[in-house]
């Protein structure tokens, strides 16, 4: 984070292979660097990945949604720290925006492509979830990802 806070997550290519591949590709391009968490709802989730910072931006393409309601086996529950792809009402509309669960939201299970989990820095998710927001759930003080990196442990993506 811009303030020096660090979150680390593990990704699950066995659960959502295309989603993980897309996320890693965007990370490697520096797509998420200097991007804010533009939507923050305490007790629910924090959302980022829009380079415009307003909730409508993306990479210029969308990917197939890897979740049960869209014909994919994905049993990763939306519990605290889980990463999942944000999308519109259309199941195959995710691109770059993702959210990190602040609290459990079982109503999202099977309806959104969960693909990873925060393994270090869950307190940072909590900290971001507790910042004051405006009427659009946008933090009054930017919560910016300074640099997002990935370690694939020798696996090519």
Predicted segments with their positions:
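Cyclophilin-like peptidyl-prolyl cis-trans isomerases
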Residues: 1-157
């Amino acid at each position: 984070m811009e303030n020096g806070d660090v979150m680390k997550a593990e990704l699950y290519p066995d659960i959502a292979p295309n989603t993980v591949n897309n996320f890693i590709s965007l990370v490697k391009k520096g797509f998420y660097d200097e991007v804010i968490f533009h939507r923050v709802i305490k007790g629910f989730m924090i959302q980022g990945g829009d380079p415009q910072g307003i909730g409508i931006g993306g990479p210029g393409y969308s990917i197939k949604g890897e979740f049960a309601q869209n014909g994919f086996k994905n049993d990763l529950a939306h519990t605290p720290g889980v990463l999942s792809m944000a999308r519109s009402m259309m199941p195959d509309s995710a691109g770059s925006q993702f959210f990190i669960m602040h609290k459990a939201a079982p109503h999202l299970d099977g309806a959104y492509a969960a693909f990873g989990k925060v393994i270090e820095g869950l307190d940072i998710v909590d900290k971001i979830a507790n910042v004051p927001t405006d009427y659009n759930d946008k933090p009054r003080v930017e919560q910016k990802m300074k640099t997002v990196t990935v370690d694939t442990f020798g696996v090519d993506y």
